[in-house]
């Protein structure tokens, strides 16, 4: 029995280490190569393979600064200053969730969201949050802030089977991400992090509030 337990533990540890090696190798490759698919894209496609995934890579300089500032204002105002985790934001989210009795604020940074999008899934669990933290830690040490924001903008979801700011710009506004206005950039940023719902419910008061908030504060956003 003891031998069986030891063997089971060794197998589990080996499996966990293999996952970390896969994440490390993926991050090393993606330092200089476009990200063509993510775990979220795969899961979305597997849920309905009749619809193609819409996504088109754009380099950092080919994306409007309006959107860069908008997404930082909407999702992670301290993006250029933290090392992957906004501890004050996490504390605020915990207090807000405790008061409401449910999860209404996640407190995740852009780096954490990207780690989840690239490698994990959306269901909340301690195991997923732990793996997300490890992937975020590795990413922040292997990639520059500019690279993190570049990959995030190209891989984040903006609707059903719709990923990346270029595909979203064409879907919602029939223009390239390079030519987004401030209002259009704020609209796209406000879709996050619940794009499938807001894609069909653009009159939701929460969406309108987030768009106004983003428009107001994006002028103060610091981008890499």
Swiss-Prot record:
Enzyme class: transferase
Biological process according to GO: cell wall organization; peptidoglycan biosynthetic process; regulation of cell shape
Pathway involvement of the protein, from the record: Cell wall biogenesis; peptidoglycan biosynthesis
Reaction(s) the record says it catalyses: [GlcNAc-(1->4)-Mur2Ac(oyl-L-Ala-gamma-D-Glu-L-Lys-D-Ala-D-Ala)](n)-di-trans,octa-cis-undecaprenyl diphosphate + beta-D-GlcNAc-(1->4)-Mur2Ac(oyl-L-Ala-gamma-D-Glu-L-Lys-D-Ala-D-Ala)-di-trans,octa-cis-undecaprenyl diphosphate = [GlcNAc-(1->4)-Mur2Ac(oyl-L-Ala-gamma-D-Glu-L-Lys-D-Ala-D-Ala)](n+1)-di-trans,octa-cis-undecaprenyl diphosphate + di-trans,octa-cis-undecaprenyl diphosphate + H(+)
Keyword Transmembrane among UniProt keywords: yes
Cell compartment(s), UniProt: Cell inner membrane
InterPro entries: Glyco_trans_51, Lysozyme-like_dom_sf, PBP_transglycosylase, Pep_trsgly
GO cellular component: peptidoglycan-based cell wall; plasma membrane
SUPFAM superfamilies: Lysozyme-like
Transmembrane segments: 9-29
E.C. numbers: 2.4.99.28
Molecular function terms, GO-annotated: pentosyltransferase activity; peptidoglycan glycosyltransferase activity
Membrane topology of the entry: Single-pass membrane protein
Family that this chain belongs to: Belongs to the glycosyltransferase 51 family.
Stated name of the protein: Biosynthetic peptidoglycan transglycosylase
Species of the source: Acinetobacter baylyi (strain ATCC 33305 / BD413 / ADP1)
Lineage: Bacteria, Pseudomonadati, Pseudomonadota, Gammaproteobacteria, Moraxellales
Name of the coding gene: mtgA
């Amino acid at each position: 029995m003891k031998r069986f337990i030891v063997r089971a533990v060794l197998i589990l540890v080996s499996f966990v280490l293999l996952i970390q090696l896969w994440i490390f190798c993926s991050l090393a490759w993606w330092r200089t190569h476009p990200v063509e698919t993510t775990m979220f894209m795969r899961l979305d496609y597997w849920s309905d393979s009749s619809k193609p995934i819409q996504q088109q890579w754009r380099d950092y300089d080919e994306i409007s600064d309006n959107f860069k500032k908008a997404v930082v204002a909407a999702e992670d105002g301290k993006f250029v200053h933290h090392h992957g985790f906004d501890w004050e934001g996490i504390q605020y989210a915990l207090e807000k969730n405790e008061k409401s009795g449910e999860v209404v604020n996640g407190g995740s940074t852009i780096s954490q969201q990207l780690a989840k999008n690239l490698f994990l899934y959306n269901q909340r669990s301690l195991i997923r949050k732990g793996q997300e933290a490890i992937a975020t830690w590795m990413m922040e040490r292997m990639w520059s802030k500019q690279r993190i924001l570049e990959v995030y903008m190209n891989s984040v979801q903006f609707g059903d089977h719709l990923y990346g700011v270029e595909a979203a710009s064409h879907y919602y506004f029939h223009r390239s991400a390079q030519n987004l206005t401030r209002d259009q950039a704020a609209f796209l940023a406000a879709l996050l992090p619940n794009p499938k719902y807001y894609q069909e419910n653009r009159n939701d008061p929460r969406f309108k509030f987030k768009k106004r908030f983003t428009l107001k504060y994006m002028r103060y956003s610091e981008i890499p």
